[in-house]
Each structure stands twice: as C-alpha cells, then as structure tokens.
C-alpha cells in the first residue's frame, strides 16, 4: 500500500488524521507562500497547497518516493469587500497581537468564509488530485473585553484569521455552514474522496 506523507507542520491537521486512524509521516514543505500572487482566495489557496506538495516532492530522493503520496493543505479566511465588491479581503496569519485584534474586530458580528484546499501528489506518477471546501462562519458581536481576553489566550498565533474554531473562539461562533474540519484546516470528506482514487484506504 502507498505511504502517506503530510506536508504540514500544523498540529490541527495531524490531530485530524490521527483521529481518523490514518497512518502517516510528517515532512515539512519549505514552499514560499508569498510567491503566490493570485488575488482570488479560493484559487490562491489551491495554488498554495499544490506548491507545498510539489516543493516537498522535489526534495525527496528519487528512489524513496515511488510508494509515497504527499498530502498538502492550505487554509485561508476571507470576507466580502463592501467598498470593492469584485475584491475579497483576505485574512492570513496575524504577524502580531495588534493585527490579530484588527482581524477579530472585523469578524465581530459578521460573516466570513474559510477555504481549505488539499492537494494529493502521487510520487510515482506525478499525478495530482485536488479538492477544496468553502465554509461560512458567523461571529457574534464581540465586546472589547472579549477580544482582549481572547488575545491573552495566544490562540490567535499561527492561525489564519486570528482564531482557532476548536478552541475558545468557539464561544464566539453563532453558526457555521459547511465543513467543520475544513475550518480547522483539513476537510475530511474531500480527503476521503481524493484518497479513494488511490491505493490508500482510510475506510
């Protein structure tokens, strides 16, 4: 059977695969995400996941990769831009607490979207399979006190959109529409569909 390599340092993605009983190893991709200049958030997310997979593939010794599948993923948070309807506001990972505060204030009392893309690369054939999910997240109106308290948890660090839905940010979520695991960082239905096209089985 093929061996699965997760090209991600994300503990959330590792936790999801572990919870599904999937056997995998981890190798970190050094792909430069800033090299993707695509403005559309969905296309950008797909291209970033693909870039991560292809970057790791190039680093594997030729005789090592024949029976391996590389799984890469990317997650972006975005919102509609009322001033410029044809553009989207993309929320990456905040660089500092001030940036995280601005993102949380933007989410407060409003709707935003979370796109997660996955890319599966067969190291033997070079074949790529890709899927993505787009989910809606509705935040309650946040008080300054709530934002301040959440920032002190440090959950905003290394989190697209400055929050982790599986943590204390769940207190702020009124509802979601779409894939919960996609919002966390790895949409499992899409993962199941992609892996079913290969010799790798998770069910």
Curated annotation (Swiss-Prot):
Protein origin, superkingdom: Bacteria
Reactions it catalyzes: dTTP + H2O = dTMP + diphosphate + H(+); UTP + H2O = UMP + diphosphate + H(+)
Subcellular location: Cytoplasm
Cited InterPro entries: ITPase-like_fam, Maf-like
Keyword ATP-binding: no
Any one biological process term the GO annotation gives: nucleotide metabolic process
Cofactor: a divalent metal cation
GO MF entries: dTTP diphosphatase activity; UTP diphosphatase activity
SUPFAM superfamilies: ITPase-like
One Gene Ontology cellular component annotation held by this UniProt entry: cytoplasm
Important for substrate specificity (site feature) positions: 12, 75, 166
Hydrolase in keyword set: yes
Pfam families in alphabetical order: Maf
Record-annotated active site: 74
Protein's job: Nucleoside triphosphate pyrophosphatase that hydrolyzes dTTP and UTP. May have a dual role in cell division arrest and in preventing the incorporation of modified nucleotides into cellular nucleic acids.
Name recorded for this polypeptide: dTTP/UTP pyrophosphatase
Organism listed in the record: Treponema denticola (strain ATCC 35405 / DSM 14222 / CIP 103919 / JCM 8153 / KCTC 15104)
């Amino acid at each position: 059977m093929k061996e699965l390599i997760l090209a991600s340092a994300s503990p959330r993605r590792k936790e999801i695969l572990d919870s599904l009983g999937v056997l995998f190893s981890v190798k970190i991709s050094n792909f430069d995400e800033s090299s993707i200049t695509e403005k559309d958030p969905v296309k950008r997310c797909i291209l970033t996941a693909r870039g991560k997979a292809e970057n790791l593939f190039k680093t594997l010794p030729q005789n090592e990769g024949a029976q391996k599948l590389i799984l890469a993923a990317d997650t972006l948070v975005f919102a509609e831009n009322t001033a410029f309807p044809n553009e989207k506001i993309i929320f990456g990972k905040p660089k500092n607490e001030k940036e995280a505060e601005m993102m949380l204030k933007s989410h407060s009392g409003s709707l935003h979207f979370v796109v997660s893309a996955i890319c599966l690369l067969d190291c033997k054939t070079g074949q790529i399979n890709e899927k993505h999910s787009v989910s809606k997240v509705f935040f309650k109106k946040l008080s300054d006190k709530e934002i301040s308290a959440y920032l002190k948890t440090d959950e905003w660090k290394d989190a697209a959109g400055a929050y982790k839905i599986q943590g204390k940010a769940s207190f702020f979520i009124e509802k979601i529409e779409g894939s919960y695991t996609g919002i966390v960082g790895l949409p499992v239905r899409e993962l199941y569909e992609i892996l079913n096209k290969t010799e790798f089985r998770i069910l």
